[in-house]
């Protein structure tokens, strides 16, 4: 039914819906009407009221009026929203559907791009984080937020538009769970996308990534020289002088993080059994599985089937932003060469793998495959703009720009488009989601041939870095 139709009946879906009224009461409290309604508007309120009564969840007239106002008095849109909300409340998650066109979401008050882009990269074309939507959340507020996250994901994957008032509802739920996303006057603010990812990861207990830490020094060996630490997000510094804009590669940054870190002020015993402070070379290696406990002995309720090791995602954040001596924010403007694949074999402790070794005489190698990227455009994380990018193995890359009113979700599946995206990643990439893959050396060449365009795009990106003007023109 379009907004101009008033008398058509609405087909009632009798899927069980629980606690929807509580959610609406929280988000849309009853209020008095300030101006009289037109006859057509009253008719639409009556239609929707009848529909909700048949569902068993009647609402006050003022609440129904508010919902219709936010949806341009389109009864069908509001009814569909309630149906989708009911499915989300029941825990239903829509599978990724390749045959639909994603419409994306609308920016809420010019400050929700960090939410929209992170959720798009986590859920649009990967199910690696779907376990966060299934976990048994503690507390009413966390469960209500989880329902609205499922609503966002389901509508995104179903090709339905997510309007700004749905994003507003989601933000209200986030704040009720402790997220600080507004100023002292209650106005919404833009926040750090990586902090938002961590907030969701902690709230819904994303399993930990265990890292084996080894300290090398000239003093006597100590039990603490080898231990396991855990992370949910790997924070990678950009090598070199922050003021030097010479391009670097992500591989260089990973080497610095995993293999080239010096730790000082460690107390160890020397050869004379005297305690002394030493500096140590720290080497980290990823243990290629998820962990349900951290180094403090805290355990989470992660279900292994929701987060299989075969679908492990390594989230990386590039530390492009910092503060100078005057506590003023600054951005590191050097390009970081973001490859579609990373040879990760040297950064993984394969002896600690949680699967039986292969006895066929073929070694298993580890590599990272780029799945999603959040780019930030601006000089500080609390301003500017975020866009989300995600890869579909069959269709190519998709970009979400919630400020693009003409085409919020755009597909890139040509060599020229892919090259443009990777150049954009090098300049603005902030939050990177890589999938850890186990590959046999014998089939790597075949896979590389299939994914030829991405490697050509990678090479063109490298050529651009070699150009002093950092400008690549495709013919």
Regions found by a protein language model. Give the residues of each.
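UBL (ubiquitin/ubiquitin-like) substrate-recognition surfaces
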Residues: 2-475
